[in-house]
A protein has these predicted regions:
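Terminal domain-initiation and capping elements
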Residues: 1-367
Length: 367
């Protein structure tokens, strides 16, 4: 098997013309599409409806081509959106395909997909979510033929947060919630999903985990998890990326840790991990080898970066996640020469506090 990677620009959350063009010219067979990961131009908060707008737009395009209903398309293709394209970040989507291929001489990009059950409001940000994500991670590894967790470089999880309607439902039933603040629930949801990845990959032990540590014991974390929460989902979608000896194709993935949002060396480290050594910015030729970059952005909990105070955490007008996404997006784009980057905010249990994961998929050099 091999994984194909196709990045398209989006002029609006409902712009599917890029994918339609790829299909029309035969570059993508819709029957091979297994996942789509993208950035929309909303605010990234609990009231960001651009994500829920984008998914049905792509489902409506693909449904007649696959002979399915739009709802059935959503059952066989994973759609993961992150809202917020602040600064230079450009709205886009990356389409992933899977098709038959001979095995390569060295491990190549593999992608496993797991879907959890739906969660009740009182389970969001709790151990039920942690355990379900961990089970999905195990399933994804089995799908890809990856047996060594060190070969896993990026695990994208998108799941539900607590909307006002879900909070009201829980109150009516007398169910206790992790929090009753919809925007505040993002930290608990993201944290639970990240700890699920950490548990599934053996980065933390089951005895270390409980409801009480989620979004609190930040010394417990995964180095490869990237989690997002939105009101448009009831379950968690888990996409596990690694390099598998059972796969062929043209791509490899690598990862690194960003010490802060201006860590250019961390960006270069992720590219090098994927097989592309870069001293400063990439050359135009090497830029064409970079298929996609995924990163998380976080404001330092100290309120300072490299000894200099900033106002990310104290700005009453702009959420700190939006500040962080804008800053990191500019740093990455200055190196890769492409502002169509998947940068998501909030890193609860995703690397150590203040740090953040970054992964890059690169076209492999000839071997």
């Amino acid at each position: 098997m091999k994984i194909g990677v196709h990045k398209i620009a989006m002029a609006a959350p409902n712009d599917v013309s890029g994918l339609k063009c790829l299909i029309d010219r035969g570059a993508v067979d819709p029957a091979t599409i297994i996942a789509l990961i993208g950035k929309t131009e909303g605010n990234g908060g609990a009231n960001d409806f651009t994500r829920g707008f984008a998914t049905p737009s792509f489902q409506l395009l693909l449904a007649p081509l696959l002979g399915l209903t739009p709802e059935e398309v959503g059952s066989c293709i994973a759609f993961v959106w992150s809202g917020g394209t602040e600064g230079v970040l450009s709205p886009h989507a990356t389409i992933f395909t899977r098709s038959p291929s001979e095995v390569a001489r060295t491990p190549r990009l593999a992608l496993g997909i797991g879907i959890t059950r739906d969660f009740a409001p009182e389970e969001i940000g709790r151990m039920a979510m942690v355990e379900a994500v961990a089970a999905a991670v195990h399933d994804c590894m089995n799908q890809t033929g990856i047996t060594d967790p060190q070969a896993v470089h990026y695990v994208q999880v998108k799941g539900p947060l607590l909307t006002p309607a879900r909070v009201a439902d829980a109150r009516a039933r007398g169910a206790a919630l992790a929090t009753e603040d919809p925007n505040g629930s993002k930290a608990f949801a993201r944290g639970a999903m990240a700890l699920g990845v950490a548990l599934g990959l053996g980065e933390v032990g089951a005895t270390d985990l409980s409801d009480q540590v989620i979004a609190r014991r930040l010394d417990l974390y995964s180095s490869v998890a990237s989690t997002s929460a939105g009101g448009e989902l009831k379950n968690c979608e888990v996409l596990l990326f690694g390099n598998s000896p059972a796969y062929g194709g043209d791509y490899c993935i690598g990862h690194a840790t960003l010490s802060d949002v201006i860590d250019a060396d961390g960006v270069r480290g992720a590219l090098a991990s994927a097989g592309l050594a870069v001293n400063s910015s990439v050359s135009p030729a090497d830029a064409n080898r970079i298929a996609v970059v995924f990163a998380k952005a976080e404001a330092s909990p100290t309120g300072a970066i490299r000894g200099r105070r900033n106002t990310m955490l104290s700005d009453a007008d702009i959420n700190y996640e939006r500040h962080a996404r804008a800053a990191l997006g500019a740093v990455i784009a200055s190196i890769t020469l492409d502002p169509a980057i998947f940068v998501s905010g909030g890193t609860e249990h995703q690397c150590a506090p203040g740090a953040a994961p970054i992964a890059a998929i690169v076209r492999a050099s000839a071997v």
